[in-house]
Amino acid sequence: MNRTFHHNVSLQGIATIVLLAVVALWCFLVRSGVTPALGFVCLLLGAAGVDRLLNTTYTFTADGDLVIARGRLGKSMTICVNEIIAARAVRGTLFTARHIVIEYGCGKITYAQPQQTSEFIEEIRRRQRQYEDKDN
């Protein structure tokens, strides 16, 4: 059975998108030199940020994979659950939101920001136990 976790919308993510929108608006209002082009770039970055903030999902599939889909514009990442070495919650600081650091494979690291942090880590452990029971 598939289980999907949605991305946690953080204050830092919202602040970044608002800042990009304000800079884009300022660049469009000034209209001197290359500022309209800079405003357009900020607008595109803001749109990509909104997509990533709202459409990121973390899906545990029935065949033992964790699929991290970082929005409609971003690339998806597939990690086999039995390759996950560690998953630990990291408290956010001033500029970073709370997130989960996932260590997998041979020294590879990625992050996740699901809404239910403890349930996400429990789901990883449950799927790993389920995979080990299948092997035995």
PLM region spans:
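Transmembrane-cytosolic junction motif
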Residues: 47-64, 70
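Ser/Thr- (and often Asn-) enriched beta-sheet segments in non-cytosolic proteins
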Residues: 4-6, 57-61, 67, 76-78
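Short, aromatic-rich membrane-interface segments at the entry and exit
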Residues: 32-40
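Single-pass alpha-helical transmembrane signal-anchor segments
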Residues: 23, 40-52
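N-terminal membrane-targeting/pre-transmembrane regions
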Residues: 1-31
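Charged phosphate-binding loop/patch that engages nucleotide di/tri-phosphates or the phosphate backbone
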Residues: 124, 131-136
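Non-transmembrane, membrane-adjacent beta-strand/coil modules in membrane-associated proteins
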Residues: 54, 68-120, 135
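A general structural signal marking secondary-structure boundaries and capping sites
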Residues: 91, 128-131
